[in-house]
Amino acid sequence: MEGMCVKFDVIGLDSPCVDLAVNVRCFPKPNGAERIQNLSWQGGGKVASGMVAAARLGLCCGIMGNVGDDKYGTFCLRDFQDHGIDTEQMCVRKNRTTNFDIVISDEGSMGRSFVFYPGNAECMTEEELNIEYISNSSYFYMANLDSV
């Protein structure tokens, strides 16, 4: 792959998601409504977000994991690539969906709440893990063992 690192600083393992992040002044009461102040589409997931942050700081990063072959999976892969993260080891599951979250933050409490749709793209199997790829990194970052 052109531009790939000889050795990675960090490789992550994750089942990334797409976040629709919305900000409201306050949460509406039941059956109420509140105007959205701001919204954005973002790649998400603990490890995925960490990889993007590390890449923005100049580290050489790679990501392993799974997405569906839907528009959200395409979004995740493009977002990693736009940040210079190697996606060679990502598994794209045919006829499967990628995790999706709506992240609601409100100015009143300064908190965040999540509403999520778990995609059905299966996690990587042990057989799909490329140990040579992982060993070509100074650090390996994963959030939980459910990723495999």
Q: Language-model segments: which ranges?
A:
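Short, basic and Ser/Thr-rich N-terminal targeting/leader segments
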Residues: 57, 96-99
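Flexible domain-boundary/linker segments
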Residues: 27-30, 71, 97, 119, ...
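Glycine-rich phosphate/adenosyl-contacting loop at the front of the ribokinase-like
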Residues: 1-66, 71-82
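Residue-identity detector for threonine
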Residues: 74, 87, 97-98, 125
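Active-site loop ensemble at the mouth of alpha/beta enzyme cores that anchors a bound cofactor
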Residues: 102
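Ribokinase/PfkB-type carbohydrate-kinase core domain
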Residues: 2-18, 66, 79-92, 105-148
